Amino acid sequence: MAKKSKIAKAKKQMAMIEKYADKRQELKAAGDRTALAKLPRDSNPNRLRLRDQTDGRPRGYMRKFGMSRIKFRELAHQGLIPGVKKASW
């Protein structure tokens, strides 16, 4: 389980990214680098670290499922993820 402060920071960053997304897109299209630099740092989506939705784990994140490899394995073994089954060959 990640620290609660880190999870809260990630949520705050997501809100800021959504808030400035349109403005950032317009400035990028216009090529106005100085105005882009004046936007808040956390409004840049490259600074966001994707985290597990259930426990906030930052590493081993699987984008397709929105969770870490550990949670994915637990839920897959329980059969709670549709379309996922254990491979055997």
Swiss-Prot record:
Query: Where is the sequence biased in composition, kind Basic and acidic residues?
Result: 49-58
Taxonomic superkingdom: Bacteria
Keywords in alphabetical order, please.
Ribonucleoprotein, Ribosomal protein, RNA-binding, rRNA-binding
Pfam families recorded for this chain?
Answer: Ribosomal_S14
Would the keyword Disulfide bond turn up in this protein's UniProt record?
A: no
Question: Which SUPFAM superfamilies does the UniProt record give?
Answer: Glucocorticoid receptor-like (DNA-binding domain)
Q: Where is this region: Disordered?
A: 29-62
The biological processes this protein is annotated with in GO are: translation
The GO terms describing molecular function are:
rRNA binding; structural constituent of ribosome
GO CC entries? cytoplasm; small ribosomal subunit
- Subunit (UniProt): Part of the 30S ribosomal subunit. Contacts proteins S3 and S10.
Q: What does this protein do?
A: Binds 16S rRNA, required for the assembly of 30S particles and may also be responsible for determining the conformation of the 16S rRNA at the A site.
Q: What family is reported? A: Belongs to the universal ribosomal protein uS14 family.
What is this protein called in UniProt? Small ribosomal subunit protein uS14A
Say which species the protein is native to. Answer: Enterococcus faecalis (strain ATCC 700802 / V583)
